[in-house]
């Protein structure tokens, strides 16, 4: 099995410090919106759900495939529960967006390029989250995905009693033609939140790979990790992400039965070039200690060159986001599950610990 590593999917954005105050998520300075402030203050008093606009501060990217980041600092005196995500973006502007939960942001600057996967860039860059700061993915969006509401009673805990002290928004601007005339962008997400405690805490596990796809061939990029924590996960939503070569992305819970045979329960399977929103999982059966979570991306190349995993449209990605909740206690310490990918790691490797693999099902819709 591959080691768990905190490899964040390629990242980037311009940064704007804001504050989630005891009266609600209110940004400081010129970006503060009095209407939002009024709504948040009144809703906070009643314990109802309020909405906070976490948006790019009218940025104008001038470099193709630029990743920009912007943060908000969560009020450390109050615990909040995020219960919904309403994107404010279109695929004509933003290739994708990620929302990170961090102990500290990747830099003390108010704005930065967070595209650290882009080795070709000469610009100074930093990760979305600081080192050893409990980096985790909370939410992801691409290809005109619609609003996501969490199940009743479920929420992402941030603030006082959570390791998430900052939220960092990342936007990947793949194409910048529309900004050449000085136009600006405020892509982002409206966060629905409440101070009313949620017993069911939400978490997101990001599974993905490194690797490469040979020219003019179909390749499988695969990963799998074992749950080694005494927790019961209730999966409820999943999201897939590739670039242009992705054909099918599938995810499974793998459990060994009393006869020693592995049973593969499908969690989700999609064409990654359809709207990359969070969909209901195929099954909601619990995931327990000792289970494995396995993901395959079936990639088909018509290019006359090798395509590597990387941040740009000329590269590829293989990502599967699994959203779950726990009934008791905290969410998984494991936030990421990555492998080396092809040509080094495959489910069928003798040391993977996997057998009874549904090869055909995992690669067909």
UniProtKB/Swiss-Prot annotation:
Catalyzed reactions per annotation: a [peptide]-C-terminal glycine + 2 L-ascorbate + O2 = a [peptide]-C-terminal (2S)-2-hydroxyglycine + 2 monodehydro-L-ascorbate radical + H2O
Compartmental location: Secreted
PROSITE patterns linked: CU2_MONOOXYGENASE_2 (PS00085)
SUPFAM superfamilies assigned to the protein according to its UniProt record, in alphabetical order: PHM/PNGase F (SSF49742)
Expressing tissues: Expressed in the central nervous system (CNS) in a small number of CNS neurons (approximately a few hundred). Expression is present both in cell bodies and within neuropil regions. It is strongly expressed in neuroendocrine neurons (at protein level).
Pfam families the UniProt entry points to: Cu2_monoox_C, Cu2_monooxygen
Binding-site residues for Cu cation B, renumbered to this chain: 241, 243, 317
pH dependence: Optimum pH is 5.0.
CC terms in the record's Gene Ontology section: extracellular region; extracellular space; membrane
Keyword field: Copper, Disulfide bond, Glycoprotein, Metal-binding, Monooxygenase, Oxidoreductase, Secreted, Signal
A single BP term in Gene Ontology: sexual reproduction
Signal sequence, renumbered to the chain: 1-24
Function field: Monooxygenase that catalyzes an essential reaction in C-terminal alpha-amidation of peptides. Produces an unstable peptidyl(2-hydroxyglycine) intermediate. C-terminal amidation of peptides is required for normal developmental transitions and for biosynthesis of secretory peptides throughout the life.
Protein name: Peptidylglycine alpha-hydroxylating monooxygenase
Organism of derivation: Drosophila melanogaster (Fruit fly)
Gene name as annotated: Phm
């Amino acid at each position: 099995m591959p080691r768990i590593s905190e490899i964040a999917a390629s990242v980037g954005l311009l940064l704007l410090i804001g504050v989630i105050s005891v009266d609600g998520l209110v940004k400081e300075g010129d970006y503060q919106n009095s209407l939002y402030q009024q709504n948040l203050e009144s809703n906070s008093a009643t314990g109802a759900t309020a909405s906070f606009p976490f948006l790019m501060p009218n940025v104008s990217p001038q470099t193709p495939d630029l990743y920009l980041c912007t943060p908000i600092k969560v009020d450390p005196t109050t615990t909040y529960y995020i219960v919904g995500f309403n994107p404010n973006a279109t695929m004509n502007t933003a290739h994708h967006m990620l929302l990170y939960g961090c102990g500290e942001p990747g830099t003390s600057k108010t704005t930065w390029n967070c595209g650290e996967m882009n080795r070709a860039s000469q610009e100074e860059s930093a990760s979305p989250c600081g080192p050893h700061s409990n980096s985790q993915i909370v939410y992801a969006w691409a290809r005109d995905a619609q609003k996501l509401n969490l199940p009743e009673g479920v929420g992402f805990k941030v603030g006082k009693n959570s390791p998430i002290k900052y939220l960092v928004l990342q936007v990947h601007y793949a194409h910048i033609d529309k900004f050449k005339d000085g136009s600006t962008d405020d892509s982002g997400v409206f966060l629905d939140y409440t101070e009313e405690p949620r017993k069911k805490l939400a978490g997101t596990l990001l599974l993905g790979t490194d690797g490469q796809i040979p020219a003019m061939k179909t390749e499988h990029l695969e990963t799998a990790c074992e749950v080694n924590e005494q927790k019961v996960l209730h999966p409820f939503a999943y999201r897939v992400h590739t670039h242009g070569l992705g054909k099918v992305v599938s995810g499974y819970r793998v459990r060994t039965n009393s006869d020693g045979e592995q049973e593969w329960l499908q969690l989700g399977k999609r064409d990654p070039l359809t709207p990359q929103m969070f969909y209901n999982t195929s099954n909601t059966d619990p995931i327990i200690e000792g289970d494995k979570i396995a993901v395959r991306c079936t990639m088909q190349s018509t290019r006359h060159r090798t395509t590597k995993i990387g941040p740009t449209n000329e590269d590829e990605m293989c990502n599967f986001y699994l959203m779950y909740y726990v009934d008791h206690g905290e969410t998984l310490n494991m936030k990421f599950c990555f492998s080396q990918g092809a040509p080094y790691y495959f489910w069928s490797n003798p040391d993977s610990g996997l057998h009874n693999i549904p090869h055909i099902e995992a690669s067909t819709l």
